[in-house]
């Protein structure tokens, strides 16, 4: 069987099963869904989030992989735009886009940009509502470039440690100038510990 163009990887929790189901329903009704696989891993919290991400990564068959957590959201054209970018830009190692983020009630936009340094995050726009950073695990990564990168066995910081590895293996990027992903963090409901440094 021909591998899919994109593997969407979702670590999930049983206490958010309705959110996970809504995400899947949103994905399957988008044009281009026949070219992807959506892998969802539920567990009883016996594994860390890092190990859940690692298991999903090792199970993926797509040419590209992208993480979408069960409490995140995607645009109505998320699948379509990513499949178009993958097919029209075969040279790309990573495909970036913009993200709508809501962090403990504070909304802002994240502009993922290949080559941007997280240690020099650039806050732009009125009231510092736009943040520029390097490609994150939610972006679409060519699997052959990053399949050997390992997630840490931890419930916090596994994403940053993984992208620090992955960025070293990509040289060419394509950016989609649109918000395709929505990230929500609420300290009242998250299963991860609160970071010591907040955005």
Locate the predicted segments by residue.
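Acidic donor-binding loop at a coil-to-helix junction in glycosyltransferase catalytic cores
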Residues: 156-162
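The conserved acidic donor/metal-binding loop of glycosyltransferases
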Residues: 69-73
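Active-site donor/metal-binding and catalytic loop motifs
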Residues: 176-199
